[in-house]
Amino acid sequence: MTSRREFVLASAAVLGANDRIRAAVIGSGGRGQLLTGEFKELGTEIAAVCDVYEPNLNAGLKIASTGAKAYNDYRRVLEDKALDAVIIATPDHWHARMAIDAVEAGKDVYLEKPMAHTIAEGADIVKAVRRTGRVVQVGTQRRSFDVWIEGKQIVDAGKLGNIRLVSSIWLNRQGDFPERKLEGKLDWQQWLGPAAKRDLDAFRFFNWYYFFDYSGGLLVGQAAHVVDAIQWFMNSKYPLAVTCSGGKPNLKGVEVTDTASILMEYPENYFATFTLGYKAMRYHTFNDQLTQFHGERVRLDMGRESYALYPETSAMELKPVAEKKQPGAFWKTATTAHVRNFLECIRSRKDPNAPVEGGQATNIVLTMALDSLRSGKRIQYNPETGRVRS
């Protein structure tokens, strides 16, 4: 694997000292700040930071390149013709509008997952990206992590035999929200954007992840990674039907549950499940995030940072025939590799590891899951019309 230093030096050699990729970060909360650091370490000039909340903006500027410009309106960012790319790490309900505006302004985009908030939004993103020819990487970094790339190769090689069932779990434990107050200027109307208008609500602002107007919560946020990986491994573009059920939220004052299961039915004649439990014991093992591909000959267990192959003859499943473990690698290595792939594709103009078509395939499932969760019905998808029905 190319080291960070080797990548930066190679990029400089190809582009020249005055041809560094110049990017802006739109949305400078926790994830936006992490990505700012990743891009900067890989030789990108972070020339601008945009956020509607003053403390986030200031925090992002401290990490960005020297002389970075500050904005609170993303449209002004896109007017800068010297920018090559933008990094979108805003709440989910803004993803589609910002991504489409960015590619139409001639920018390449690193777009955090989930790609969109509705099926129609995702379809519009795909059309805009293909119409403009821009490079867009969706932030599902498992596609760039060598452990998961090797797992995909194992499935593609047919080692598991026919796969009729894929099961997955994501376990964690989350405490109550800390009490927080606004500590600087916030452009509330700009933050709401395409969402329903309402009076300023600091609790909603800080905990937007758990309200349906802005996101699908942990259910969508974590399933985005797992569902994307399942469909990537299985070469699936859409489900036939999705059913989701969940309990009441364990956290006070929010809408989206943190304990739920999704059942996905596919035209390739297999079923997949995803179960989220955020009031569970946090397993400090490779199995707190586990996706199992149940082949007729071999089972493949994909952990967050590991994989293991178990044939029928594995005594008590204690001795896999093949395995790989990289403890602690995912949190840093996967994102770094994903950002590196995006930067390489800006130069080569090739499709990145997580193209928008894959992002939309996942977005379809996630949107259907939320529809099912809220309606209590099995949701069916029509690939000809791109519409759903119960």
What is each model feature region?
Residues 91-92, 96-144, 158, 376:
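Beta-strand-loop-alpha-helix segment that lines the small-molecule cofactor/substrate pocket
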Residues 1-11:
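N-terminal secretory signal peptides and thylakoid transit peptides that target proteins
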Residues 31:
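Hydrophobic/small residue at the entry helix of a nucleotide-binding pocket
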Residues 86-87:
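N-terminal Rossmann-like NAD(P) cofactor-binding module of classical short-chain dehydrogenase/reductase
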Residues 44-62:
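NAD(P)-binding Rossmann-fold cofactor-contacting core
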Residues 60-66, 128-129:
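Short, conserved SAM-binding/catalytic segment
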Residues 150, 162, 167-168, 175-209, ...:
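Contiguous beta-strand/loop segments that form the cofactor/metal-binding neighborhood of enzyme cores
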Residues 68-73:
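Conserved SAM-binding strand-loop segment of SAM-dependent methyltransferases
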